Amino acid sequence: MKAEIHPDYHTIKVVMTDGTEYLTRSTWGKDGDTMNLDIDSKSHPAWTGGSQQILDRGGRVSRFQKKFSGFLKKG
C-alpha cells in the first residue's frame, strides 16, 4: 500500500436527533469534532414506517416539488 494517501481516521462524537450521543471512528472532521444528525434511524420514514415527516431544511424539497410539479401531468 502507498503511504500518505489515506485520510486521517479518528474519533468523533455523533449526536442523534433525540440527543443520544455516541463515539465512533470516521474520516469526517477532526479528532474530537461533533456531528449533529438531521435525520437518523429514529426519525427517517424508512425506519419508522412513514409516520414522521422529513424536515425540509433550506426549502430543498419545496423547490424540487415546485420545479417538477407538472412533469408527469397529461395535457
Curated annotation (Swiss-Prot):
GO terms for cellular component: ribonucleoprotein complex; ribosome. Disulfide bonds: none annotated. GO terms for biological process: translation. Keywords: Ribonucleoprotein, Ribosomal protein, RNA-binding, rRNA-binding. GO terms for molecular function: rRNA binding; structural constituent of ribosome. PROSITE patterns: RIBOSOMAL_L31. Belongs to the bacterial ribosomal protein bL31 family. Type A subfamily. Part of the 50S ribosomal subunit. Binds the 23S rRNA. HAMAP family: Ribosomal_bL31_1 (MF_00501). This is Large ribosomal subunit protein bL31. It comes from Nitrobacter winogradskyi (strain ATCC 25391 / DSM 10237 / CIP 104748 / NCIMB 11846 / Nb-255). The gene is rpmE.
